[in-house]
A protein has these predicted regions:
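Intrinsically disordered, low-complexity terminal tails and inter-domain linkers enriched
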Residues: 115-199, 423-430, 449-455, 515-520, ...
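Short, conserved catalytic or adaptor-binding loops enriched in Gly and charged residues
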Residues: 107-113, 143-147, 160-163, 256-257, ...
Length: 635
């Protein structure tokens, strides 16, 4: 991946984050305690913005701190809340001798403030907003008398175990759901009501700062007990960096894991918080800037990137439209889709092509589908699929071809796909091919077809495959369990062997390709469960086809000036932006129809509004460039 695209947000694994952290401290000279303080401030602000309603008075807060630097972040956060007048309990872990140097220092600071908070000016006694000056909309204290420092308690492992004693109940997820709404009390010897009116064993907020991203083995012993206990508390829950028990590498649950309502991660997205099941444990996800920047990678950028739901997608999503343009200026798509009597997939994919900005569409489908195609999609041209279909002529006409939605796996479908790939390899100008659905199944079952695909990519041709997990398992000739246990590694192996751009569709869709021998990937953050419906993949193949055609036109205008690596990267960007747009369409459709009632056509219905918003963003970016230059616009 060339340089640093400021539209993108990097995804790091534990080692990449460790390297960035180390370079920030050692090379740039940023003190570790400064980074920790910024992390605590960022976490505090994110929590206040998430739950302003619970901070209208004195709040009871629990911070579970480990003995490493994640625990140090937690101790610093505990201090900030304590000095704001809240009652804070810090549950520390292990022996002090095993604390990291930063954690030890943070605990020393915290204890000194705890010992010295009496006798100071009661700056909040008038009930004013204790966070005034931080730009935070937090309710005032409603006249409640709160001293400048709240109550601070530090609990060791032994003290915590003594308080939970033999009455600690560890609930399963099902049991916890069954008891939802009940006030779970596990500190059984502290059930008396405190002067704030809350049970002394209950907390308004619990913060997980036990492990962070360094965890690589299963959680056991007292840590497992702590996480289970934390999960049973009834208040709000926040995690620092990543929920404890979630692998930062692959999102797997290492024995057990903290279930957060909000996760504030520092510097960059952690891979494990974007992949399932880890993503489910994070709740709302936020990245906080604490001073570790992309410059800290020293030119060795991470392999992973993402776009969050607030990112701009205008750069390569839309092709600028000149007033004197014509319909051929914005990409011509050839769609081989549908089988006899089953035109649904072809209609969905075809309409998605046109709604995504392509100038022209030609559909090749069996004769039985002709009447409904012409009636339902009159804007498209139609060609009857037959033994003698002139694929060479059709391929010469288009800028991109989509193969697969609903074509079946019969002899004619397989022969047609073979002819397409053969003709594509013989053409002077290679064109992008999008393979979906039955096109993928045919490729998985035919050595001849898979060989043609490899030959085409070897000569510089672009093939974008869009399998869901079952289709990907067939392509890899492995079982689902084997695929899911090492999803990224399996995807990497496949793209290295085949040379394709691979879109692994799932709840967290991953797009990957090989860049000069290095596996690069994108993890998508848009979309919702309502998109798990028939035809959603056909819509994606249509969006992908339209955007591939637009990219082909854009690259063709450069008259071959782009090198092969740059071309492949351009289509990687095309693929992940199509996935991003597809997910955004799903999110917008869910706002109108709800996730339960959504159907694939709702995604298409959302595209005009979304692309209109992109056009507005592009105009705004153009004005900014005119007045201020390219600063801050990425590419």
């Amino acid at each position: 991946m060339k340089g640093y695209d400021r539209k993108m947000e990097y995804i790091v694994d534990a080692e990449e984050m460790r390297r960035a952290d180390e370079n920030t401290i050692q090379y740039f000279g940023m003190p570790q305690l400064v980074l920790m303080e910024r992390a605590a401030l960022a976490a505090r602000d994110a929590i206040l913005r998430k739950w302003p309603e619970i901070f209208s008075g004195s709040v009871r807060i629990l911070v579970a701190a480990g003995n490493g630097n994640n625990g140090g972040d937690g101790a610093a956060l505990a201090r900030l809340f304590f000095l704001a007048g809240h009652d804070v309990t810090v549950l520390v872990s292990g022996q002090e001798a095993k604390y990291s140097s930063a954690m030890k220092k943070q605990m020393e600071i915290l204890k000194k403030y705890g010992d010295d908070h009496t006798g100071r000016k009661d700056e909040f006694a008038d009930g004013g907003n204790r966070y005034k000056g931080h730009g935070l909309s937090v309710p005032a204290d409603s006249g409640q008398k709160v001293k400048a420092g709240g109550n601070l308690r530090i609990l060791t492992d032994e003290e915590w175990k003594a308080k939970t004693g033999g009455n600690l109940r560890i609930l399963t997820d099902e049991e916890r759901e069954a008891e939802a709404g009940q006030n779970l009390q596990t500190l059984t010897d502290e059930r008396r009501t405190s002067e704030t009116g809350k049970s002394a064993g209950d907390y308004d907020l619990a913060v997980d700062a036990l492990f962070g991203i360094g965890l690589s083995r299963e959680v056991s012993g007292i840590y497992r007990e702590k996480i289970a206990w934390l999960n049973q508390l009834s208040g709000k829950k926040a995690a620092l960096d990543i929920p404890s028990g979630i692998s930062a590498q692959d999102g797997s649950v290492l024995g057990c894991a903290f279930r957060a309502d909000l996760t504030i991660t520092f510097g960059f997205w952690k891979r494990g918080m974007l992949l399932y099941p880890g993503r489910e444990f994070c709740g709302e996800r936020k990245v906080a800037d604490i001073g570790i920047t992309a410059e800290s990678f020293q030119g060795e950028y991470p392999a992973g990137i993402t776009l969050d739901k607030k990112s701009e997608v205008t750069g390569e999503l839309l092709l600028s439209r000149s007033p004197d343009s014509h319909k051929g200026s914005f990409g011509k798509v050839l769609l081989f889709a549908g089988s006899a009597g089953t035109p649904g997939a072809a209609l969905l994919a075809g309409e998605a092509v046109l709604r995504s900005g392509a100038g022209m569409l030609q559909i090749v489908s069996p004769a039985e589908n002709r009447e409904i195609m012409i009636t339902r999609l009159p804007e498209a041209m139609y060609q009857v699929l037959a033994e003698d279909t002139d694929w060479e002529k059709l391929l010469g006409w288009c800028d991109a071809v989509v193969i697969g939605p609903g074509i079946g796996q019969g002899r004619l479908a397989e022969q047609s796909m073979e002819k397409i790939l053969t003709h594509m390899s013989e053409m002077e100008r290679q064109k992008p091919v999008v393979l979906d659905a039955d096109g993928l199944n045919l490729a998985a079952s035919s050595g001849r077809l898979s060989g043609l695909i490899k030959a085409y990519t070897a000569m510089g041709g672009i093939v974008i495959m869009t399998p869901h997990m079952a289709e990907l398992a067939r392509l890899l000739h492995c079982g689902m369990q084997e695929l899911q246990s090492a999803r990224l590694k399996n995807m990497e192996r496949f793209v290295r062997e085949s040379g394709v751009v691979l879109v692994g569709k799932d709840a967290a869709t991953v797009v990957g390709y090989a860049d000069k021998g290095v596996f690069r990937y994108y993890i998508n953050q848009t979309g919702n469960s309502g998109m798990a419906t028939a035809g959603s993949g056909d819509v994606l193949s249509g969006i992908m086809g339209a955007m591939a055609a637009l990219t082909a036109v854009k690259l063709h205008r450069k008259a071959g000036k782009e090198k092969e690596a740059a071309v492949r990267e351009a289509y990687f960007r095309t693929a992940y932006r199509a996935v991003y747009l597809h997910g955004l369409a799903g999110d917008k459709a869910a706002e109108k129809s709800g996730e339960i009632s959504m159907k694939a056509g709702d995604l298409i219905g959302a595209l005009p509004e979304l692309l209109g918003e992109c056009t507005d963003q592009r105009r705004t970016a153009g004005v900014q460039r005119y007045f201020f230059g390219d600063a801050g616009n990425g590419n």
